């Protein structure tokens, strides 16, 4: 895998696993004793964490470093969690849309 493609895959996975585990960038940064700007750069592919940080992240997320950097398939458990998160995200999006529609109707009634 070319270097740039690998770095982008790492960035995507870092963001994916962080959100899957419910951390904000600031919370994760605090756990790692790094700045939230560093975490943001990692997730945008502008920088890559060193192997020590990747190892720590793999322990936090309960995955291998290989999974974290996209070199092996995600485990079945991780895939199931991802599906559940996506389902929840869609449900939240629908609820948000309904709430906005209700608010608009209420505003029109006034």
Regions found by a protein language model. Give the residues of each.
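Residue-level signal for the short linker/turn that defines the boundary of a DNA-recognition helix
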Residues: 12, 22-23, 49-52
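A secondary-structure capping/hinge motif
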Residues: 38, 45-48
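A short, Lys/Arg-rich alpha-helix, primarily the initiator
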Residues: 1-20
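Short, charged recognition helix plus adjacent turn
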Residues: 70-106
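DNA major-groove recognition helix of helix-turn-helix/homeodomain DNA-binding modules
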Residues: 52-67
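Short alpha-helical DNA-recognition segment
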Residues: 22-41, 56
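Residue-level detection of the helix-turn-helix DNA-binding "recognition helix"
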Residues: 19, 33, 44-46, 73
């Amino acid at each position: 895998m070319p270097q740039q493609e690998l770095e982008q895959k790492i960035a995507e996975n870092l963001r994916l696993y962080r959100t899957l585990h419910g951390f904000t960038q600031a919370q994760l940064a605090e756990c790692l004793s790094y700045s939230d700007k560093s975490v943001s750069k990692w997730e945008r592919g502008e920088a890559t964490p060193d192997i020590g940080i990747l190892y720590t992240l793999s322990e936090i997320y309960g995955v291998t470093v290989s999974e974290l950097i996209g070199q092996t398939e995600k485990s079945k458990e991780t895939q199931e969690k991802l599906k559940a998160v996506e389902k929840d995200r869609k449900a939240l999006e629908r609820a948000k849309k309904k709430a906005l529609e209700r608010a608009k109707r209420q505003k029109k009634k006034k």
